[in-house]
Amino acid sequence: IGDIEFDESQIINFPEGMLGMPTYKHYLLLQSAEIAPFLRLQSVDKPSLSFLLIDPAFIDPGYRAYVEKADQNRQYIQNEDSAVLVVCKIAKEGKDITANLVAPVVINHADMQGAQVVLLDSPYNVRHSLAEVSERTEA
C-alpha cells in the first residue's frame, strides 16, 4: 500500500467490514510517533480509506470492562490478546476531535480477526469530545 511495507501476517480480517463499509475487509493497524496516542486502521483493499483510532482508556478507564460485559453473547473479546479501540473523527477546522464510544473496534490479535460492534443501550456517546479528556488531564 503506497509506502507502507507489511507482511501478510499483519493483515487483520474484518469479516463484516467496518460499519457502513462492508466491502473492505482487510486492514493494518499502524502506530506512528507522529500521531500518538492515536493509531491508524488502514484498509488494504482501498488504500485511500483509513480510520483514526484511540485506546478508550484515555477517555474512560472502565470502558473495556463495560464492552466486555455488553459483548458477552458475541464474544469478540475472547482473551487478553484482544484490543478494544474507538474510532475518532477530526472536525473540519481541526479544532475538535470526537470519539465514537457506541461502536468500538475489537481486534483479536491471536487470530487476526476484527469487528466493529454496536453497544446497544449504551450510556456512552457517538461523538464524545476529546477536549473534555484533555481538560481533565491538564487539571
Identify the role of each PLM range.
Residues 1-61, 80-139:
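Long, compositionally biased stretches
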Residues 73-77:
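Short, solvent-exposed interaction modules
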Residues 63-70:
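Short beta-strand-centered segments at strand-helix junctions
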Residues 66, 78-80:
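Glycine-rich, N-terminal phosphate-binding loop and its surrounding beta-alpha-beta segment
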